[in-house]
């Protein structure tokens, strides 16, 4: 315990030293608001109503019943059907960033609360230091995997978590968990970190977690988009894509979740679009690095389950995203598992997570291409027998700017779903 306290004490010292240093002058969104349109017709609303007025729009989320879009206020006021749901964007942005008061509070609670890491959102350097600390704290359970480098030269890190060496049980099923594919979805990053910490911290003291790590392998990537995530801290809290160059010099970034090489489509949008898929499959460096890694290690990991964390809208999405005409294999069991995940969350926190086909969520049934090249479809079709995307809290009051006091509640409810998922993979008859 002394060794553990020493490690965490050093981590806190570094954390307090660097927190705030990575925060830059944020993009000003005082002239923008988020509008909710009660329409399920994406094509009519965006292509026929909004696009003729401006190309400065950003679709935050879409569902069967509504579409949330960030617009300049002067444009939003010209569209009668929209209801303002977020008007104070700069204030909400600041509320997601750590403060000096928070740092003082963390120093005070450290001795009695190792969960202090989850009191606030954390920048990329801090998260990477924390992953390295976990490897040192749990050397028999954790190995940091280096998947490759991003366009800006940052490492793409994963944690391999297992209670015993793969050669002792070569048939162990592997669960892959990813977060932060879209840079601004900070709650997805914190939620993945919460899950991996619970698995490690409870090993040996909880029968369930001990069984999970002894009988399953986990590959966990908390920040799938390191460049974009770092940029949300230093420049623009609402940045979505990665940061690589495109064929249009003034337009940086590819949407990683449109870059995977299953049912990929060449971009129909301008390179400046938030959903720009690039000019070739796997053009996004992060998607390419992951593809190369899982091919090189396919003899080491038998990937059986995949959970991709996103925000927002409180939904559990199942394949396929690219088309509503393509039926997934084993649909009945896939739906049963989806509703089981939703029930586990509801039992834990009372929150309702709707179960929806990813194609409906993406709007692929209305405008083909919106769900092309997704990580969900790629992993489901090529690697994982079971694959889901979880869109976390909330349902629109804060959108991507969920206050940090939600980190632990979201972590707890989502971890309940992960435990259900693990139980299912170990015993499909539950």
UniProtKB/Swiss-Prot annotation:
Keywords noted in UniProt: Cell wall biogenesis/degradation, Disulfide bond, Glycoprotein, Metal-binding, Secreted, Signal, Vacuole, Zinc
Residues of this chain annotated as glycosylated in UniProt: 41, 295
PROSITE patterns xrefs: CARBOXYPEPT_ZN_1 (PS00132), CARBOXYPEPT_ZN_2 (PS00133), PEPTIDASE_M14 (PS52035)
Domain Peptidase M14 as annotated: residue spans: 120-425
UniProt xrefs under CDD domains: M14_CP_A-B_like
UniProt: Zn(2+) binding residues: 182, 185, 310
Superkingdom of source: Eukaryota
Cofactor: Zn(2+)
Annotated GO CC locations: extracellular space; fungal-type vacuole
Binding, substrate: 182-185, 240, 257-258, 311-312
Annotated compartments: Vacuole; Secreted
GO biological process, one term: proteolysis
Function: Inactive carboxypeptidase that may play a role in cell wall organization and biogenesis.
Membership in a protein family: Belongs to the peptidase M14 family.
The protein's name: Inactive metallocarboxypeptidase ECM14
Lineage, top ranks: Eukaryota, Fungi, Dikarya, Ascomycota, Saccharomycotina
